């Protein structure tokens, strides 16, 4: 079997050309947009915290291991499916394997992206809101209680949350309406460049604060003892198990794999570069942003004696107080939330493009019509989350939480791991696309090749890890539901 036969057939390629499939204008655009999709809020409010908790650089090494053996292969598979088919997930599986009933899987990614946007647009709106709040001095003179009150007041105001959610949707869909090259690629390249520049400025400011050294040591100096913290041997191994699970989860979830978020970008590129090399660059950029976020947060928190927590409370309650204590704190705080806004919007624009491409391929719509229909759909579906902190605050599920937590649980604990498993089966199984065809597509072009010797690991190792992630995500919740915890 030749490389040409093993990838997309000439008929598929000719059909794509006749259909006028849009293309990225540059390789840099593809890398930055794919990285922008991966770089999200978890890079800021989760990765730095668990890195410090489990031994700094010791945990980073563990994380990088799982990024390479778990996240990277699945990312290459998503890119390969997109590039070989020259279609979004709406038609990719039928194009590559028309004799099997893989077409139902196309809806998995579409629904997953929709649910992701149901809460991500609201949280992205928080970032825009805080750029304004920090810039106008809303936190001046406030202590931790006052900062928490500002955050609570925002959540309790449905009009404010809906307004900022609408602003995020308008920005995202407006960019997508301008087209792939003139809109999505051009704007995202500018936004990602600004994100990196703002991060560098904030890192320099944070590292030069008096007392920042303690935060740097906590974050980066390897402490393998923290990987085995505990009084007894069983406690020590339990800590190590938690660290391994945290590393696996972070490596897996940070890339948003399994809902075809990356697949569509593969359909916009040619075959001049191998996909493994491109995926390595994207993962490296995503990891770099996460590491830089820690260099902003920990030195600043330690410099002012503030305990760095995890999650939204770190970003929306703790950090405004830290910025308050800095000279020119309003400026640094506004820049930080501008960086956070760019991180959120880069993901939102990328996923919006995925949704738009899906309906364009599925129903033959032009871009403008697809944008309007998806904009209305996303806004309507985002309302429950925006109202979930106030009008619908009584809606919750035990062990999961409010509406936003429920939506996040559906995507993160279910659709991402199971979707990744399905991509894996499709790419290596004879009943799917097949290993030889996938490998030929992944290796087409110059650059790093996908290791052919890794097939046994793909067959047995990755499925086992994905099942562990899936089960571990449910274990504490099931224990609570059964009254065992």
Task: Explain the meaning of each model-derived region.
Residues 18-21, 50-54, 89-108, 121-181, ...:
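Inter-helical loop and helix-membrane interface segments of multi-pass membrane transporters/permeases
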Residues 50-54, 80, 101-117, 152, ...:
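Membrane-water interface regions at transmembrane-helix termini and the short interhelical loops
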């Amino acid at each position: 079997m030749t490389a040409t036969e093993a990838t997309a057939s000439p008929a598929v390629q000719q059909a794509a050309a006749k259909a006028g499939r849009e293309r990225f204008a540059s390789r840099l655009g593809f890398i930055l947009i794919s990285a922008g999709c991966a770089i999200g809020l978890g890079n800021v409010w989760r990765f730095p915290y668990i890195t410090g908790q489990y031994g700094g650089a010791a945990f980073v090494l563990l994380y990088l291991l799982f990024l390479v053996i778990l996240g990277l292969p699945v990312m290459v598979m998503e890119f390969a499916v997109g590039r070989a088919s020259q279609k979004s997930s709406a038609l990719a599986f039928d194009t590559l394997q028309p004799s099997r009933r893989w077409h139902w899987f196309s809806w998995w990614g579409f629904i997953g992206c929709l649910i992701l946007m149901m809460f991500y647009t609201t949280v992205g709106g928080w970032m825009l809101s805080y750029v304004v709040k920090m810039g106008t001095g809303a936190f001046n003179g406030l202590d931790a209680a006052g900062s928490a009150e500002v955050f609570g007041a925002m959540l309790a105001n449905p009009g404010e949350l809906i307004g900022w959610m609408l602003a995020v949707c308008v920005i995202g869909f407006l960019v997508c309406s301008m087209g792939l090259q003139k809109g999505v690629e051009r704007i995202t390249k500018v936004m990602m460049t600004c994100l990196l520049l703002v991060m560098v400025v904030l890192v320099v400011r944070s590292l030069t604060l008096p007392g920042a050294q303690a935060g740097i040591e906590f974050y980066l100096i390897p402490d393998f003892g923290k990987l085995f913290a505990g009084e007894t041997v069983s406690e020590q191994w339990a800590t190590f198990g938690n660290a391994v699970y945290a590393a696996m989860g972070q490596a897996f979830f940070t890339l948003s794999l399994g809902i075809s978020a990356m697949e569509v970008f593969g359909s916009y590129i040619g075959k001049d570069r191998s996909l493994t090399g491109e995926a390595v660059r994207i993962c490296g950029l995503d990891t770099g942003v996460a590491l830089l976020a820690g260099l902003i947060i920990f030195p600043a928190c330690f410099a002012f004696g503030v305990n760095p927590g995890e999650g939204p409370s770190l970003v929306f309650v703790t950090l405004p107080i830290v910025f308050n204590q800095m000279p020119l704190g309003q400026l640094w705080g506004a820049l930080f939330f501008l960086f956070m806004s760019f991180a959120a919007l880069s993901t939102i624009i990328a996923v919006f493009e995925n949704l738009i491409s899906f309906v364009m391929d599925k129903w033959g719509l032009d871009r403008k019509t697809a944008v309007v229909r998806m904009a209305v759909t996303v806004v309507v579906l985002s309302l429950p989350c925006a109202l979930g902190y106030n009008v619908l605050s009584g809606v919750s599920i035990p062990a999961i939480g409010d509406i936003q937590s429920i939506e996040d649980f559906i995507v993160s604990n279910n659709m991402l791991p199971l979707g990744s498993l399905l991509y894996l089966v499709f790419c290596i199984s004879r009943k799917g696309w097949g290993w030889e065809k996938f490998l030929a597509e992944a290796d087409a072009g110059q650059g790093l090749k996908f290791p052919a010797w890794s097939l046994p690991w793909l067959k047995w190792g990755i499925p086992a890890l994905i099942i562990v992630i899936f089960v571990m995500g449910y274990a504490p919740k099931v224990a609570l539901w059964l009254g065992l915890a």
